[in-house]
């Protein structure tokens, strides 16, 4: 692409300049992943999580509280954090009146990712000007919100405590992380429903590519409990058929899928400019070569709760273009696939965007079969799983999918939906998320 400029149009061409924008694009900094952290229903650290996803271990359990509250769906995925573990990340003062599961999960995942990247937690007087965080969430401190409402309505405002604002403000998670790590670059929170985690990674990627930071801690988190999940239960989008068989409840791409299983957790990634990672001898998990976010505008078939297929396909194609990847180079897809009626449509959108069908379609899997739908945390938890697949050379299985939906089998081959772990070297993997509000995000990860 070239563009001609003249100094003065009235005087005619005095001088002409040709600017090759392709060269400018090639000057974008390469960005790699140097650290991972995970708090998931089936694994709190990388070792436990990797073991779980390789072996198809579910983190979905029956929840007595949901039964007591007469939820239709009485199963969910919730990370188990002991009091002892909390004290490894928070001091006694911080834990006083602390009741925010989302911030808890996010801080643990973030600090673990930071340490995994070989970075230190130093109490310096000066911030780390080269490092920042964009860490997303859908809500913050919903449990603290509930407590605060009761106290205010009971005329006990003075008993709210000094940390209620920090726990309930939308940016609470990034503020906690920024303070613990002394981050001096951008420290902010994004929120785009189920696309939040994927979007946070793309935002961090762009900041590094543009030379505004050397490294960014990106990811997302989601609160736990009935006050988050109740609205979805009321919408009848959660399964109610597996209260007695929790591990069988989350069934993406299955003919017997009956709705998603709510869950929670957090995923975190340290992403870094390649030059910086090489200079300090950091471990490199994979490279992020590009991505894209867009919206269907809630037009056409798009609504507040349903995606516009044209927008989804445009998002995938734009991500590939940004990454300079041909559709035929995609080895695997980590889908959004929630175990609802929209799974068929998602597969169709992938086939249209990639122009690949039948036996030519890449492998595709859904982490939600094991951990449920982590809402705002889903994109980041699934991205951690995607990166692990590239780094360790495997494709995790789709559990609860022994009866693949016939409409899906009309589009792609059965072998594209692995039921058992496959050991395979992966070069390029796509990760996509689609959320309420008709918003979409897609990332392209590549082996380094």
Q: What is each of the regions a protein language model found here?
A:
Residues 106-119, 170-173, 178-181, 187-221, ...:
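Active-site-proximal alpha-helical scaffold in enzymes
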């Amino acid at each position: 692409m070239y563009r001609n400029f003249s100094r003065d149009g009235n005087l005619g061409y005095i001088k002409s300049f040709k600017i090759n924008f392709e060269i400018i694009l090639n000057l974008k900094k390469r960005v790699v992943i140097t650290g991972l952290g995970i708090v998931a229903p089936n694994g709190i650290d990388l070792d436990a999580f990797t073991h779980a996803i390789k072996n198809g271990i579910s983190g979905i359990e029956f929840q007595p509280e949901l039964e007591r509250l007469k939820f239709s769906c009485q199963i969910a995925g919730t990370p188990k954090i002991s009091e002892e573990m909390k004290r490894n990340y928070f001091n006694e003062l911080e834990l006083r009146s602390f009741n925010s599961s989302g911030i808890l999960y996010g801080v643990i995942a973030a600090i673990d990712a930071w340490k995994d990247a070989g970075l230190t937690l130093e109490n310096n007087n000066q911030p780390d000007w080269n490092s920042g965080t964009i860490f997303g969430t859908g809500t913050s401190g919903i449990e603290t919100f509930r407590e605060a409402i009761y106290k205010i309505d009971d005329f006990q405002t003075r008993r709210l405590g000094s940390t209620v604002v920090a726990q309930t403000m939308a940016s609470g998670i990034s503020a906690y992380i920024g303070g613990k790590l002394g981050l001096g670059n951008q420290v902010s929170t994004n929120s785009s429903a189920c696309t939040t985690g994927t979007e946070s990674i793309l935002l961090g990627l762009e900041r590094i590519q543009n030379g505004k930071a050397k490294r960014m801690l990106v990811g997302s988190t989601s609160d736990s409990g009935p006050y988050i999940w109740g609205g979805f239960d009321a919408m009848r989008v959660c399964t109610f058929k597996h209260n007695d068989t929790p591990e069988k409840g989350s069934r993406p791409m299955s003919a017997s899928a009956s709705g998603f299983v709510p869950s929670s957790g957090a995923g975190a990634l340290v992403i870094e400019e390649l030059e910086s990672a090489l200079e300090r001898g950091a471990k490199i998990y994979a490279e992020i070569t590009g991505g894209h976010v867009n919206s269907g505008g809630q037009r056409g078939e798009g609504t507040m709760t349903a995606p516009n297929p044209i927008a989804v396909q445009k998002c995938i194609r734009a991500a590939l273009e940004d990454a300079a990847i041909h559709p035929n180079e995609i080895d695997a897809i980590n889908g959004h696939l929630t175990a609802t009626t929209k799974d068929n449509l998602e597969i169709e959108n992938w086939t249209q965007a990639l122009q690949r069908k039948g036996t030519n379609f890449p492998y595709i899997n859904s982490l939600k079969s094991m951990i449920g739908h982590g809402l705002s945390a889903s994109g980041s938890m699934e991205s951690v799983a995607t990166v692990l697949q590239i780094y360790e050379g495997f494709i995790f299985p789709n559990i609860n999918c022994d009866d693949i939906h016939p409409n899906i089998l009309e589009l792609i081959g059965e072998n594209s939906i692995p039921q058992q772990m496959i050991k395979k070297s992966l070069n390029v993997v796509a990760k996509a998320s689609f959320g309420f509000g008709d918003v979409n995000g897609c990332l392209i990860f590549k082996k380094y």
